[in-house]
UniProtKB/Swiss-Prot annotation:
GO terms for molecular function: ATP-dependent peptidase activity; serine-type endopeptidase activity. Belongs to the peptidase S14 family. The keyword Chloroplast applies. It catalyses: Hydrolysis of proteins to small peptides in the presence of ATP and magnesium. alpha-casein is the usual test substrate. In the absence of ATP, only oligopeptides shorter than five residues are hydrolyzed (such as succinyl-Leu-Tyr-|-NHMec, and Leu-Tyr-Leu-|-Tyr-Trp, in which cleavage of the -Tyr-|-Leu- and -Tyr-|-Trp bonds also occurs). HAMAP family: ClpP (MF_00444). SUPFAM superfamilies: ClpP/crotonase. This is ATP-dependent Clp protease proteolytic subunit. The gene is clpP. It comes from Helianthus annuus (Common sunflower). Coiled coil: none annotated.
């Protein structure tokens, strides 16, 4: 029997009685954000809106983004990454479960020294993919060109934020490279591994 999203009591400052709000709403008020699905425009826009709102509300308190994502669409993921760099508060990224593909790109985008993985987390990097079925030749060439630009952008960010040489990141992005939490730390995707 599905129970839906759990509700928890929350008392707004100055109010006597607590009201019941869904757990994510309560956690957002504590500046705790969650990416627990495939990255698409909807979740990306929701997280971007929350980051901007919380940044306007108080730009001195850090934000915490918990990630358990199989990856997803490149453009919405890059938009989320750019927002993380844009907002004034530091964004801590925490990998729990897995951060694959675009999930690992968002993970590496956290404030350097404030990127963490749980001990049994898994991280995977690879190159962006496109779908070229039933595409005319001219469009195919344009799409390949755009895909190469996106790959170049992602590679540049991984190089900048991990400290790895371009040739290492480029070679690793040629295929799916899976890493444990400690391997992701050695690679420079995260800075810390939580203690068991």
């Amino acid at each position: 029997m599905p129970i839906g999203v759990p509700k928890v009591p929350f008392r707004s400052p100055g109010e006597e009685d607590a009201s019941w709000v869904d757990i994510y709403n309560r956690l957002y008020r504590e500046r705790l954000l969650f990416l627990g699905q495939e990255v698409d425009s909807e979740i990306s826009n929701q997280l971007i809106g929350l980051m901007i709102y919380l940044s306007i509300e108080d730009d001195t308190q850090d934000l915490y983004l918990f990630i358990n994502s199989p990856g997803g669409w490149v453009i919405p993921g890059v938009a989320l990454y750019d927002t993380m760099q844009f907002v004034q508060p530091d964004v801590h990224t925490i990998c729990m479960g897995s951060a694959a593909s675009m999930g690992s790109f968002i993970l590496v985008g956290g404030e350097i020294t404030k990127r963490l993985a749980f001990p049994h987390a898994r991280v995977m990097i690879h190159q962006p993919a496109g779908s070229f079925s039933e595409v005319a030749t001219g469009e195919f060439i344009l799409e390949v060109g755009e895909l190469l630009k996106l790959r170049e952008t992602l590679t540049r960010v991984y190089v900048q934020r991990t400290g790895k040489p371009v040739w290492v990141v480029s070679e690793d992005m040629e295929r799916d490279v899976f890493m444990s939490a400690t391997e992701a730390q050695a690679y420079g995707i995260v800075d810390l591994v939580a203690v068991e």
